């Protein structure tokens, strides 16, 4: 009887329920009943309105089987669901999806790894189905949380743990594919979801034993790697996620990366951080690269007080990002990048200076030394980043960056620099000067300007050649190297490397062009400034061999790039003045430096004589070099800059044949049409306002001795020494007149300098004002001479603006006593 009741009840059940029940066999090991499954599928396709009921009933059975741990029937139910999903059309599948997702959620909530993997696989199949019209009410918050948790599985069995993590990654990939394509349903990009998805992927990527070092887009991994290696699968999912990011949600995808790297302390060492940001930069669209750079800069600002190695790690990541972004769109962040980097460069120097001042003795010194080295790592990373970024900019932007960096360099006596150096002190200021010039050197590398005026405008050249940047030999080296980068427009510097006597300059195959009008104008305006810098740079006591090599290269590059006949004469005057300064030695230079200057002059005159190809000049230079080779090899660069070179005790006893003589050079050049009148006038460097303010020795005092005893130290054929009787009256007169002579010289120099550099309008206005003043003075004088003298016979009164005389009677007049009889 009970059997007949059950049969009767089953016959009264709805058809979709009977079809669903029939697909389950009595023994779950037999698997899905295929014939009944085909009937159920046909029914669902024929009556799509029944799909939601079919799904609800399947979900009910699956929930019951999950609770009762009947895994066999759970597998059959999910297999049936998958087949129904694949068979039904996309338009009719929507009512069925809610039941399907509910069943997947039940499986993911279960504690059995097998069921979790089963639910994930079903969800991935669902994610690959394209829907014509998405359902905006459908949310995937639960799946994001659950799949992210599976990515961090800590199961005791390694194989099961790997399987669960792979399932979690594949689930996240499915969520991404299902949601990110629809811009109207962008909830997946919200921070609360990205804060779960991105760290989960990075956690699995971090498990790679050897971090992938490829720098370009990766080759497609094999199917086996995708299925078995969580790290490879996570990396591909991460790339896919970033590739789908748009302008509005880029930052939400990148910021969790910083949080993960901070939390796990992955900036030092930073191999994984670099790897992550390479993936980011290659995966996102090129026009969004500057967003990532901005985020890195912002994070660097936020971590500015962290350990030096952490900051260095962030800066190296920035370098890698800039290296990739510079190839495409760099966005409007150029000045922001440099401004932030220079700010952190100043902070690093300040930290270094504070550590040096705070360290005292013992272990503190060791700790201070370690921090000092770490700060140098930070500084080198910043300079490398600045240089790489700057070298990839177009020329018009690079010139702006050059001016920007130069404006940051602290220069004595000016307040134009924009870096705060109040806390640095002298040592810190010198350090920041070196760091900024090194940055400038990196930016100017490879810069090619059509005219030298474009490369070295006055606003850039004046602070670059400031005496404040001559206090240290390393500063002078950097200044000269920056000038070489900007002057060398034909790549000749490599051919001039190393100071030496070149037997045949033609073998160097120097490239040069005709000097243009703009370059000629530049030398007329700024030539004396360049000569002065070279002249003073040669006379510094802390010069090393590299300084002399760079000074020689500077003279050679000016000759190649900027020299016409007038400039050649000026350069020869400069060389002779350097020779005279080494002989006179008014600065009390060591013998090595004096011989180094003599060697520098010899190398340059040998070069310039062959460049202008005047036979008599070449012959004189060659003769002096030949005599030096035999009698005074320490006057040649090949010997003086060699280790253990024998130095003379003095230079006063040397014969004139060892020196380059002005009259000989003038005679040889005059015969070839050169205007040599100025060769007889000794070179005198300009005196700047900064020289008066700075601590450097007065150039006027330096030059005065040179002019007076020049002829006595460099003997020539037509110079006769005269003796003068020295008396007390002569000495008294010389003392009284020396101050006035110096004042007159200074006045003349200022007048000449003003007429050379001041604009025409300014000179005309000043002359006009002087003419007006003179006219007023003349009018006053004429008025006094024409006006009659006051008479005792009357007095002058002024009424209503008119002068009137009032007469005095004779008896009231007052005469002098001598006039009265």
Curated annotation (Swiss-Prot):
SUPFAM superfamilies: ARM repeat. Palmitoylated at its N-terminus, anchoring the protein to the plasma membrane. It is a lipid-anchor. Belongs to the EFR3 family. The modification Phosphoserine is found at residues 360, 363, 422, 694. GO terms for biological process: phosphatidylinositol phosphate biosynthetic process; protein localization to plasma membrane; synaptic vesicle priming. It is linked to Genetic variations in EFR3A may be associated with susceptibility to autism. One of its GO terms (cellular component) is cytosol. InterPro entries: ARM-type_fold, EFR3-like_ARM, EFR3_Homologs. Component of a complex required to localize phosphatidylinositol 4-kinase (PI4K) to the plasma membrane. The complex acts as a regulator of phosphatidylinositol 4-phosphate (PtdIns(4)P) synthesis. In the complex, EFR3A probably acts as the membrane-anchoring component. Also involved in responsiveness to G-protein-coupled receptors; it is however unclear whether this role is direct or indirect. The keyword Mitochondrion does not apply. It comes from Homo sapiens (Human). Component of a phosphatidylinositol 4-kinase (PI4K) complex, composed of PI4KA, EFR3 (EFR3A or EFR3B), TTC7 (TTC7A or TTC7B) and HYCC (HYCC1 or HYCC2). This is Protein EFR3 homolog A. The keyword Iron-sulfur does not apply. It is found in: Cell membrane; Cytoplasm, Cytosol. Keywords: Autism, Autism spectrum disorder, Cell membrane, Cytoplasm, Lipoprotein, Membrane, Palmitate, Phosphoprotein.
């Amino acid at each position: 009887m009970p059997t007949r009741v059950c049969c009767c009840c089953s016959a009264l059940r709805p058809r979709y329920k009977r079809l669903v029940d029939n697909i389950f066999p009595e023994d779950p090991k037999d698997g899905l009943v295929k014939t009944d499954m085909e009937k159920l599928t046909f029914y669902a396709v024929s009556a799509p309105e029944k799909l939601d009921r079919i799904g609800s009933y399947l979900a009910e059975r699956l929930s019951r089987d999950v609770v009762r741990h009947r895994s066999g029937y759970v597998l059959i139910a999910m297999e049936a669901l998958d087949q129904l999903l694949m068979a039904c059309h996309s338009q009719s599948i929507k009512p069925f999806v809610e039941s399907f997702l509910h069943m997947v959620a039940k499986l993911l909530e279960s504690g059995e790894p097998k069921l979790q993997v089963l639910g994930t696989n079903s969800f991935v199949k669902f994610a690959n189905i394209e829907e014509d019209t998405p359902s905006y009410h459908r949310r995937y918050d639960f799946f994001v949380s659950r799949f992210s948790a599976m990515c961090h599985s800590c199961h005791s069995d390694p194989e099961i743990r790997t399987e669960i993590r792979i399932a979690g990654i594949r689930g996240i990939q499915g969520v991404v594919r299902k949601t990110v394509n629809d811009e109207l349903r962008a909830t997946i990009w919200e921070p609360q979801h990205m804060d779960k998805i991105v760290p989960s992927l990075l956690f699995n990527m971090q498990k790679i034993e050897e971090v992938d070092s490829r720098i370009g887009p990766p080759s497609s991994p094999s199917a086996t790697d995708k299925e078995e290696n969580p790290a490879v699968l996570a990396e591909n999912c991460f790339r896919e996620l970033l590739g789908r990011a748009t302008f509005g949600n880029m930052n939400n995808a990148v910021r969790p990366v910083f949080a993960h790297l901070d939390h796990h302390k992955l900036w030092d060492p930073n191999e994984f951080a670099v790897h992550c940001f390479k993936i980011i930069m290659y995966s996102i669209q090129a026009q969004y690269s500057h967003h990532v750079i901005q985020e890195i800069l912002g994070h660097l600002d936020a971590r500015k007080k962290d350990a030096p190695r952490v900051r260095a790690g962030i800066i190296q990541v920035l370098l890698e990002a800039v290296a990739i972004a510079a190839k495409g769109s760099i966005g409007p962040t150029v000045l922001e990048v440099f401004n932030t980097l220079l700010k952190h460069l100043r902070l690093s120097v300040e930290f270094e200076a504070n550590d040096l001042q705070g360290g005292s003795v013992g272990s503190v010194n060791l700790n201070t030394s370690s921090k000092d080295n770490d700060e140098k790592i930070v500084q080198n990373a910043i300079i490398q980043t600045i240089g790489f970024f700057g070298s990839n900019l177009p020329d018009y932007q690079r010139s702006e960056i050059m001016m920007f960096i130069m404006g940051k360099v602290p220069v004595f006596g000016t307040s134009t620099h924009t870096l705060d150096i109040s806390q640095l002190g002298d040592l810190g200021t010198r350090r920041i000067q070196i760091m900024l010039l090194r940055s400038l050197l990196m930016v100017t590398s490879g810069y090619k300007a059509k005219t030298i005026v474009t490369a070295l405008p006055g606003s850039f050249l004046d602070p670059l050649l400031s005496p404040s940047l001559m206090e240290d030999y390393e500063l002078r080296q950097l200044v000269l190297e920056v000038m070489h980068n900007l002057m060398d427009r034909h790549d000749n510097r490599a051919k001039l490397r190393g100071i030496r006597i070149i037997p045949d300059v033609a073998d160097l195959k120097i490239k040069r062009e005709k000097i243009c009008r703009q370059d000629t104008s530049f030398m007329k305006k700024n030539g004396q400034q360049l000569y002065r810098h070279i002249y003073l740079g040669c006379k510094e006591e802390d010069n090393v061999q590299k300084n002399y090599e760079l000074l020689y290269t500077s003279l050679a590059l000016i000759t190649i790039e900027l020299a016409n006949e007038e400039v050649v004469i000026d350069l020869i005057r400069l060389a002779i003045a350097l020779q005279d300064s080494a002989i006179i030695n008014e600065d009390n230079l060591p013998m090595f430096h004096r011989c180094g200057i003599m060697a520098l002059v010899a190398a340059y005159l040998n070069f310039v004589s062959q460049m202008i190809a005047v036979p008599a000049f070449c012959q004189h230079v060659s003769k002096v070099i030949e005599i030096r080779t035999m009698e005074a090899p320490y006057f040649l660069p090949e010997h003086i800059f060699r280790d253990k070179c024998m130095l003379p005790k003095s230079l006063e006893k040397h014969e004139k044949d060892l020196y380059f003589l002005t009259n000989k050079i003038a005679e040889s050049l005059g015969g070839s049409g050169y205007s040599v009148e100025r060769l007889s006038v000794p070179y005198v460097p300009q005196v700047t306002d900064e020289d008066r303010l700075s601590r450097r020795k007065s150039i006027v005092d330096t030059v005065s001795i040179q002019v007076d005893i020049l002829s006595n130290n460099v003997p020539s054929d037509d110079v006769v020494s005269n003796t003068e009787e020295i008396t007390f009256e002569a000495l008294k007169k010389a003392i009284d007149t020396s101050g006035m002579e110096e004042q007159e010289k200074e006045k003349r120099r200022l007048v000449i300098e003003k007429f050379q550099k001041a604009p025409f309008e300014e000179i005309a206005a000043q002359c006009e004002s002087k003419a007006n003043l003179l006219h007023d003075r003349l009018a006053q004088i004429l008025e006094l001479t024409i006006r009659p003298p006051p008479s005792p016979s009357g007095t002058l009164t002024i009424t209503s603006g008119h002068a009137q005389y009032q007469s005095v009677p004779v008896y009231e007049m007052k005469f002098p006593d001598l006039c009265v009889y």
